[in-house]
């Protein structure tokens, strides 16, 4: 049975121009904050889609909080359109690259994290963090497994890798269980 995997965060980056006047952009955009002594970029929060955009003087833009790449693209195009209408020279429909996706799912059981921590590529320090960290090399992702059975997969570039990673982890846990019990 296919696990129900839900994307909870997509981080993308793009280039919207060069030499952006962040003070001017902050005046134009609603919900924008620019405090260069605190952070070198302009932070703009949108409610629809619900994302945060970080715009840097170099023209680099990062968007975080989207539930899918399409939402990030909508948000970026919305901001670019607003800034262009105010006279800024920016790139139309900039190419957007997924940097990271985070997905969640359930194991469907409460795993013994101490047993799993005997496997290679795992870290488990319950005094520091309640989840077991499992680093896969193929696909290159990090899987966090919690005692409740909740699983968080991070470092994804495409959603298909979440299914591949979950399948690998499930098989490994099944083999470990057969070996131990």
Swiss-Prot record:
Q: Which InterPro entries match?
A: TBP, TBP_archaea, TBP_CS, TBP_dom_sf
Q: Which domain of life is it from?
A: Archaea
Under the heading SUPFAM superfamilies, the entry gives: TATA-box binding protein-like
Q: Start-end of the sequence repeats?
A: 7-83, 98-173
NCBIfam families given for it?
A: PRK00394.1-2, PRK00394.1-3
Described by its record, this protein's role is as follows: General factor that plays a role in the activation of archaeal genes transcribed by RNA polymerase. Binds specifically to the TATA box promoter element which lies close to the position of transcription initiation.
Annotated family: Belongs to the TBP family.
In its keyword annotation, does this UniProt entry include Chloroplast?
Answer: no
What's an example Gene Ontology biological process for this entry?
A: DNA-templated transcription initiation
Coiled-coil annotated residue ranges, if any: none
**Full protein name:** TATA-box-binding protein
GO molecular function terms attached to this record? DNA binding; DNA-binding transcription factor activity
Q: Report whether Repeat shows up as a keyword of the record.
A: yes
Organism from which the protein derives? Methanococcus maripaludis (strain DSM 14266 / JCM 13030 / NBRC 101832 / S2 / LL)
Q: Per its UniProt record, what CDD domains does this chain match? A: TBP_archaea (cd04518)
Q: Pfam families, from UniProt?
A: TBP (PF00352)
